[in-house]
Design a protein with these regions (language model features):
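RNA-interacting cores
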Residues: 1-277
Length: 277
């Protein structure tokens, strides 16, 4: 799995939606399409979303337009992209070609951000499990949910709270769909519920409704599709957890920085930063 960290900068100020991940996703597809149309189409069609896109991270100005903010001129913005499918080395290389070798920009609806710097990191599922096994038994996972995290519980019902079962079961599904068969994790709801305690920071908690797609109406037009989710900070501590459960949950937490948490991660949702204490 790979993670790409881009630093972006705009020459002029321009508006972007409050939930800018959807626009960034479209810009990424456009950039991929200029290099390899088949890869772009596969990303668009993938049920996993294939990539995790953090959306723009940085300091924004206010906007007169409803539900918008403004990119500041000459202000640095971060963009994190994660690729977790082991078959997607091609995708990673295509992104490198688009943004580094070809000097491409992120072209949004109202303006452009140029790529100023680029860093990449990689890991395997096995390496994350090895790192997790080195963590002490009293460790705490500190998770910052940077963008709206939309976890579907049943049908179209989404959770609006960073509950331990919801968060780590979401990550477990992503892990087992992308890991080699011999590294699949078998950890049930009861094990997570009985071994992990979540401690959210009420001062940082917020809820959101964000645009993630546009779908066709019966009359040939389109309508916006929204997802509901939460942002904030939450610590996850262990209580009487077995070593296997502790290692699995810790590895899943680290995996979340590559995969994102919940649904619509390719469109800017579920971007997290994880620390260990």
């Amino acid at each position: 799995m790979r993670r790409i960290e881009l630093t972006l900068r705009a020459d002029r100020s321009f508006p972007v939606p409050d939930s800018d991940g959807y626009q960034v996703y479209g810009a990424l597809l456009d950039a991929l399409d200029t290099v390899d149309a088949s890869v772009s189409q596969r990303v668009h069609d993938s049920p996993l979303g294939t990539i995790h896109n953090s959306g723009l991270r940085g300091s924004f100005a206010g906007s007169d337009r409803p539900h918008h903010k403004r990119v500041r001129a000459n202000e640095p913005y971060g963009l994190s992209l994660g690729v977790v499918d082991r078959d997607d080395e091609e995708l990673f290389e295509t992104l490198v070609n688009a943004f580094v070798l070809d000097g491409d920009d992120i072209r949004l609806a109202e303006g452009t951000l140029r790529v100023e710097s680029f860093e990449s990191s990689n890991a395997t599922h096995e390496e994350l499990l090895e790192r997790a096994s080195d963590v002490g038994s009293n460790a705490t996972l500190d998770v910052e949910f940077h963008t709206a995290t939309c976890i579907e519980e049943a049908g179209e019902v989404t959770t609006m709270f960073p509950h331990r079962v919801s968060v780590f079961r979401s990550l477990l599904g992503k892990w087992n769909r992308t890991a080699p068969e011999e590294l699949a994790l078998d950890i049930g709801r009861e094990a997570i519920a009985g071994s992990v305690i979540e401690k959210p920071d009420p001062r940082a908690y917020d809820t959101h409704s964000v645009l993630v797609n546009r779908v066709e109406n019966g009359d040939g037009g389109t309508r916006p599709l929204f997802r509901q989710g939460f942002t904030g900070q939450c610590s996850y501590a262990f209580k009487n957890a077995s070593e296997s459960v502790r290692n699995a949950v810790t590895a899943l937490g680290m995996f979340g920085e590559y995969s994102g948490v919940g649904s619509a991660v390719a469109r800017g949702c579920g971007s997290v930063e994880v620390g260990l204490e």
